[in-house]
Amino acid sequence: MTNIRKTHPLTKIINNSLIDLPAPSNISAWWNFGSLLGICLIIQILTGLFLAMHYTSDTATAFSSVTHICRDVNYGWIIRYMHANGASMFFICLFLHVGRGLYYGSYMFTETWNIGIILLFAVMATAFMGYVLPWGQMSFWGATVITNLLSAIPYIGTNLVEWIWGGFSVDKATLTRFFAFHFILPFIISALAAVHLLFLHETGSNNPSGIPSDSDKIPFHPYYTIKDILGALLLILMLTLLVLFSPDLLGDPDNYIPANPLNTPPHIKPEWYFLFAYAILRSIPNKLGGVLALILSILILAIIPLLHTSKQRSMMFRPLSQCLFWLLVADLLTLTWIGGQPVEHPFIIIGQLASILYFMILLVLMPIISIIENNMLKW
């Protein structure tokens, strides 16, 4: 008798993507982040659902409803902090996942890569709207500053901003619609993640060497299921440590002050995972130019496959490209630091140099170094 796992229409899908999936025999821990992102998404949807049961999306009660969750709801504090810090873990996994893709040339699977970029934008949009919901000072002013960027669009900008706000400023209408979008987007993200996986399974996984591994495949279960469980345990351990020991480590103290449209905080800044893009935005003196640079800082990933000039897929055997890659990582860390600093000397010039270097590495230096490495192989 044939196993029901392999024949039933529902279990067959699970079997072919999680159990009998042929996987390369040499994929490292850098390939764990897909499953970790799935776990992050599940944690966020579940904690978010329980928070939504007690949250009210009204300017008069939003802040106090979050306080009520933390003080009066059974284990509300742990649900709230798991959701807030779960977002940070989500972005850590996202950045490492994208970094892995850049390093090992996984971007050559263009469909998977492009869906991944759409997913990144969707998660960033969700996180931004979620940050507005507690209706603290940084929530309100962050929403005001970021939505206001759309007014830089010629001709339709002002109308567009007022349409998004639902009025002439960030107010009740804005909060209500942000809550609605924040609730629906994770389900759209789940659907996109399924499409991401669908495209990946058309080609099979890449591996650290970048060499096709069709001749050497092993079943996903038990080898990679046990490996993913180890990764998941480490993720949950890190999240638990963060939530139980320093839940406010990555947050902004200003968000414990209720939103006040008459009082601007001294330094408006987003959550840490947006600081690199925020630094790029601020480094350009022109408003429209800054907005374009902000969008391009992520959208640039879409043209990475077109800029691949190397004869090798992975950076595993390309020491010069490796040096550039780690320079890019250092540059992004610098941008993250600058994004959290006030707009004054020397931070302005550091931010501008780091922004130029970011685009230089991806658009100019990487392709040139790859060509040099190709020629070095001839010597």
Curated annotation (Swiss-Prot):
A ubiquinone binds at H201. Its cofactor is heme b. It comes from Mustela lutreola (European mink). InterPro entries: Cyt_b/b6_C (IPR005798), Cyt_b/b6_C_sf (IPR036150), Cyt_b/b6_N (IPR005797), Cytb/b6-like_sf (IPR027387), Cytochrome_b (IPR030689), Cytochrome_b_C_euk/bac (IPR048260), Cytochrome_b_N_euk/bac (IPR048259), Di-haem_cyt_TM (IPR016174). GO terms for cellular component: mitochondrial inner membrane; respiratory chain complex III. The keyword Transmembrane helix applies. It is found in: Mitochondrion inner membrane. Heme b b566 binds at H97, H196. This is Cytochrome b. Belongs to the cytochrome b family. GO terms for molecular function: metal ion binding; ubiquinol-cytochrome-c reductase activity. Binds 2 heme b groups non-covalently. Heme b b562 binds at H83, H182. It is a multi-pass membrane protein.
